[in-house]
Regions:
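Short beta-edge/loop segments at beta->alpha junctions of small alpha/beta modules
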Residues: 1-80
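Short coil/turn segments at secondary-structure boundaries
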Residues: 22-23, 109, 165
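Amphipathic alpha-helical interface surfaces
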Residues: 35, 92-93, 145
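Short gly/ser-rich loop at a beta-strand->alpha-helix junction or flexible surface loop bordering the NTP-binding
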Residues: 51-54, 87-124
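Generic structural signal for hydrophobic core residues of well-folded globular domains
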Residues: 81, 100, 152-156
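Basic nucleic-acid-binding interfaces
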Residues: 84
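A short, charged helix-loop
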Residues: 122-133
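Hydrophobic alpha-helical interaction segments
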Residues: 133-168
Length: 168
């Protein structure tokens, strides 16, 4: 129905470009099937982008360098899922190393520790996000930097820390 589609599009525009959302954000506008169909039509028309199954984005457009559509990052999608599910997440492995600047490698599949539901999310770019259930003590850090450092050092391994790592 066009009315639901207009309501959804107006709300998405208010949130701004780069916003990640799902059908559950628009349940006040109508029946779940109608909302899903409206999102499907909007994605087909190019107003929004389907990032993963059930997850959409109002894309940013790069006008300065003419790069076109800028897709949301792993972090944006993962943070949206965590917020929606009321879960805590923290990146692990090579992605934690990349976030800290200890590695230039950007992994194709990112793994997050979570206290929420474990799952795999396939992004349309062929990449993926994996949420692995963990003990609450692994998420108990009060400082995000300390948590990332701990997980990055775990990835590097005991005795494998080099002078180059220490310089960063």
């Amino acid at each position: 129905m066009q009315v639901i589609e207009d309501k959804i599009y107006n709300k998405v525009k208010k949130c701004g470009r780069g916003t990640v959302f799902s059908s559950s954000d628009f349940t006040a506008f109508g029946e779940p099937r109608s909302v899903l169909k409206a999102l499907e039509r909007m994605a087909a028309s190019g107003k929004i982008i389907r990032v993963a199954r059930g997850i959409y984005c109002y894309p940013k457009i790069d006008k300065v360098l003419s790069l076109g559509v800028i897709y949301p990052s792993f972090e944006d999608v993962a943070q949206y899922i965590a917020k929606r599910d009321r879960a805590r997440i923290v990146p692990t492995g090579s992605y934690a190393l990349n976030v800290l600047g200890l590695s230039t490698q950007v992994p194709a599949n990112v793994v997050y520790l979570t206290d929420g539901t474990p799952r795999k999310v396939k992004l349309l770019s062929g990449r993926g996000i994996t949420f692995v259930k963990t003990a609450p003590r692994n998420l108990a850090f009060t400082n995000r930097l300390a948590m990332l450092l701990t997980l990055a050092l775990r990835e590097i391994g005991e005795g494998n820390v080099t002078e180059e790592h220490k310089q960063h």
